[in-house]
Structures are given as structure tokens and as C-alpha cells.
């Protein structure tokens, strides 16, 4: 039980360090940036396999992989996701004992593809294990686009 609570606390710490900004629409060489919101206060269920696809389009599928990590305070509730109007892109990394953050950089649309760029920042070895997770929320209008992930390590 302590391990689960500690993993939830670490997930919240990681998501708190993630950018809270929403990307805006701009034109750049045939691509348009897509607005997204970072979902907070969710944890990956440890009895699940890492999803093969980063795209989750239904609440049922989302709830299969993620649980709510409600904490006290003003920003303690999980970010609301309306799957009738939105879908999510998730990045779930394997369990590690190295401090790891996943930071969304941008999402761009070009033709029928979404290019999701994110950074993975690794730090010091820890005495405990975490499972790094990042969830971003996008408008349903992009749901049918093919998703291509672009990872940057720092």
C-alpha cells in the first residue's frame, strides 16, 4: 500500500512540474499547431500493460488504464475530460528507478497526421520506482488523424 501511495505522490510531483500552458494555433511551413491541455492527477494502473497506441478515444478505455489521484487543495481534482468532445494522447514509460519527467512540447497537424512532440528528462537514480506518465487532451476534431510521436531526450 505504501508503494502505491508513494507512486501516486511521485506521479503528482511529476505532473506538477509539467508545463501548464495550452498551445495555440499557428502556421509554420504547412503545419498548424493544435491546442491541447495537460491532464493532471491521474495514475497508470499497475495491473495493465502499456497501451500500444497513444490515442484513447473513450472513457471506458481510459478508465481501464488510468485511475484518479485526487489530493487535497485547490488543484487536487483530476482534470475533467469530456470524451464526447475530446480525446487524449498518453505517453506511458516503463517502471524505472531513475527520476523521469515527460513534458509535452507541441502537437502539430499536417495533412491527416498529428505530430506529438514531447521531451523526456531523466535525472538521478532513486531509491524507489516510478512509472512516468503524460496525458494531454485534444479536441475531438483531430481524433481520426494518425498520431506520430516525436521524442526528445534531455
Task: Specify the residue positions occupied by each region the protein language model found.
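C-terminal motif of bacterial Sec signal peptides marking the signal peptidase cleavage site
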Residues: 13-16
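Extracytoplasmic electrostatic interaction patches
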Residues: 94-154
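Intrinsically disordered, low-complexity segments enriched in polar/charged residues with Gly/Pro
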Residues: 1, 28-30, 41-42, 91-96, ...
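Acidic/polar, low-complexity intrinsically disordered N-terminal segments immediately downstream
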Residues: 23-81
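Bacterial signal peptide processing site
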Residues: 18-21
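Mature extracytoplasmic domains of secretory-pathway proteins
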Residues: 56, 60-115
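Sec-dependent signal peptide recognition
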Residues: 2-7
Amino acid at each position: 500500500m505504501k508503494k502505491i501511495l508513494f507512486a501516486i505522490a511521485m506521479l503528482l510531483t511529476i505532473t506538477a512540474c509539467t508545463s501548464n500552458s495550452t498551445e495555440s494555433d499557428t502556421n509554420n511551413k504547412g503545419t498548424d499547431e493544435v491546442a491541447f491541455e495537460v491532464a493532471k492527477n491521474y495514475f497508470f494502473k499497475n495491473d495493465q500493460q502499456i497501451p500500444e497506441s497513444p490515442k484513447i478515444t473513450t472513457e471506458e478505455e481510459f478508465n481501464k488504464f488510468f485511475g484518479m489521484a485526487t489530493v487535497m487543495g485547490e488543484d487536487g481534482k483530476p482534470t475533467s475530460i469530456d470524451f464526447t468532445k475530446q480525446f487524449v494522447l498518453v505517453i506511458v514509460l516503463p517502471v524505472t528507478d531513475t527520476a523521469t519527467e515527460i513534458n509535452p512540447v507541441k502537437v502539430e497537424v499536417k495533412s491527416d497526421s498529428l505530430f506529438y512532440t514531447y521531451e523526456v528528462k531523466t535525472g538521478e537514480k532513486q531509491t524507489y520506482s516510478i512509472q512516468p506518465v503524460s496525458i494531454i487532451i485534444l479536441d475531438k476534431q483531430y481524433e481520426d488523424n494518425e498520431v506520430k510521436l516525436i521524442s526528445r531526450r534531455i
